[in-house]
């Protein structure tokens, strides 16, 4: 049990983390070959595919699309100001469309390149793609 009275999720072993780091590098390479800007998480915030390694035992390699700051900021600002969920402003709908289209494109591109991919758990990882391994 952790110091605050609850169990922390188990971390992946060093061997698993090394494998995930290699998988993340191959993921970036495959996306770059397809013409998409791809970056490891240490450069997150840049537009393009942000690839990160989740250190939890049940984690993995995740890819999430990052838009230009102006698009994301416009959507966040509107959400923070309070909006009617039944009538979302155009900026929010556009941001959501971009995220969905790019997630689906990344899924298809990586699958075509020989990766085993799936939509990540939306509750935990939002619109990310979970890269589970390579099939080739």
Go through each PLM region and give its residues:
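N-terminal leader/targeting segments
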Residues: 1-80
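Generic alpha-helix detector with strongest preference for long hydrophobic helices that associate
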Residues: 5-8, 12, 83-87, 91, ...
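Mixed-charge, low-complexity intrinsically disordered segments
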Residues: 70-96
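Short, compact, well-ordered microdomains
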Residues: 90, 95-136
């Amino acid at each position: 049990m952790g110091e605050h009275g609850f169990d922390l999720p188990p971390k992946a072993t060093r061997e698993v983390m090394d494998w995930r780091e290699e998988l993340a590098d191959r993921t970036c390479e495959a996306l770059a070959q397809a013409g998409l800007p791809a970056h490891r998480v240490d450069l997150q915030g840049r537009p393009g595919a942000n690839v990160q390694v989740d250190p939890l035992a049940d984690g993995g390699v995740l890819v999430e699309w990052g838009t230009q700051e102006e698009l994301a900021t416009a959507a966040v600002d509107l959400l923070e100001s309070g909006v009617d969920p039944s009538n979302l402003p155009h900026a929010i709908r556009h941001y959501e469309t971009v995220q969905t289209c790019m997630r689906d494109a990344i899924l298809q591109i990586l699958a075509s390149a020989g990766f085993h991919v799936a939509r990540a758990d939306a509750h935990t990882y939002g619109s990310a793609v979970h890269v589970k391994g390579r099939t080739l």
